[in-house]
Amino acid sequence: MFKKVVIVLAVILAALAAFVATRPADYRVVRSRTVAAPPDVVHAYVSDFHKWPEWSPWEKLDPAMKRDFSGAPSGTGAEYHWSGNSDVGEGQMTITDSRPPQSVTIRLEFLKPFAATSTTQFDFAPSGAGTNVTWTMNGHNNFMAKAFSAFMDMDKMIGADFEKGLAGLDAATVAARRQ
């Protein structure tokens, strides 16, 4: 009897491992929104990590989050490290490329609760009196991340936060222009 149970468990584990192995290795999340501000204003809000608390959806999850800024004040070379509650974890972002007013590319490294690295890009295109902002995140799933993605949809999970962030970016840039 014990031998049969072990064989059944081994078959189940092998089937689960085979299923996880067939999951996509890469993920991509993309959201866009037209923001009621010109590209140079929107670019300035994204390329300066000091302005992220005004619009980033994750900043609101832990008002007591510790933030450290280093490197350039904004643009290429700017760095931002955060450490907070279980909702935000710990990680850092580095702007690896900033092309005013067209784009900002960021290396995003999560340290806690799990280690992961992604590339995030913001693209800005004039659209009437505003700017079409496209926020993209690309990353690679290791075996454990593939297992996680079997039960959680990255596009739905991160996409909802991107939508909140783009709405916050719109509100922050509009408010800044009124001052």
Report each predicted region and the residues it spans.
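Residue-level recognition of beta-strand microenvironments
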Residues: 38, 98-101
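Short, highly charged C-terminal tails/helix-capping segments
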Residues: 67-68, 170-179
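Generic structural detector for well-ordered beta-strands
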Residues: 32-36, 81-83, 94, 105-107, ...
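Extracytoplasmic/secreted envelope proteins and their assembly/folding machinery
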Residues: 39, 43-52, 77, 92, ...
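Short, surface-exposed coil-to-beta transition loops
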Residues: 28-30, 88-93, 115-121
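Extracytoplasmic/periplasmic/luminal assembly and interaction segments
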Residues: 49-99, 146-148
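Beta-strand/loop substructures that line and gate deep hydrophobic ligand-binding cavities in soluble
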Residues: 96-97, 107-163, 169-171
